[in-house]
Amino acid sequence: TRVRSSAASDVYKRQGMNIRKITDYFRAGCKEDYNRRIGVEIEHFVIKEDNTNATYEEIAELLEAVFGNEQCEYEQRSLLGCVTMEYAISLEPAAQLEISIFPRKTVQELEQIYEGFLKRMESYLGLRHMRLETCGYQPYAKAAELPLIPKRRYEYMDAYFKHTETMGIRMMRGSASTQVSIDYLNEQDFVKKFQLAQMLSPVLALLTENTAVIDGIPVKKHIPRTEIWNHVDKKRCGIVPGSMSEEFSFYTYAEYVYHVPLIFARDHGIIMPTGEWSAAEHLSLIHISEP
């Protein structure tokens, strides 16, 4: 009985320690007022002139031509992205091309960098009879027919979402989005912005809606992407439980994160699938390091 009690106590202490480390990670993200910045990520579909999706191999060749091998990043010889001084390029599950512009002081700076990226890509795309399209969902292909790029993490995500709900394939293979990152001053500022973002989310989704078809079928309802996300994984999508209450904090958010299924985790540098286990349940793999 003492051994079991001691073991349970050790697990409880370790869980508390890990939650505090996640809390410390959030706190380490606080920025001084003079140093606050904004970042943006924009995902694109790479489409050929016959309106078919460019293949992973074609997009990899395109990026190597544009950025050169020295700026490209690989996983087991497969190109996964590129990095410059101003932004990073990555490939999403079905080869959607994402630019992540490093945080800047103003929206105008982000706009200038993005326009520079488009101009840099323009001639290379033209030579290959390709173009970039920015819309919320794959405009021509069916998601289930699009293969995953050779990235281990996406294999684990794909397998996991097949067992949660019905829209994981559409989310991973068929969708694209624009994401914005905004700095916060302190915990109070974080909570205010987090809650406001969740309240504005459906409004912004409606205002920026640009999805005309889903898997070849014309869309008849508004915000179809939201409908997709509503049926991906209820444990990790939607409004964070308790986040709109007055008690919401770094710590309560850390508790939520700690108990959401991981899907995968790193073990000595190797990405391992964890299925539906959360960090709290997978203590053999998860010992969170200091931020």
Residue ranges of model-derived segments:
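Flexible, glycine- and charge-enriched loops at secondary-structure boundaries
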Residues: 1, 107, 111, 190
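Single conserved hydrophobic/aromatic residue that forms the stacking wall/gate
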Residues: 1-12, 286-291
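A very general structural signal that marks isolated residues within well-ordered alpha-helical segments
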Residues: 4, 10, 50, 185-187, ...
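Terminal catalytic/cofactor-binding subdomain
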Residues: 14-166, 174
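Loop-rich catalytic cores of soluble enzymes, especially ATP-dependent carboxylate-amine ligases
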Residues: 137-285, 289
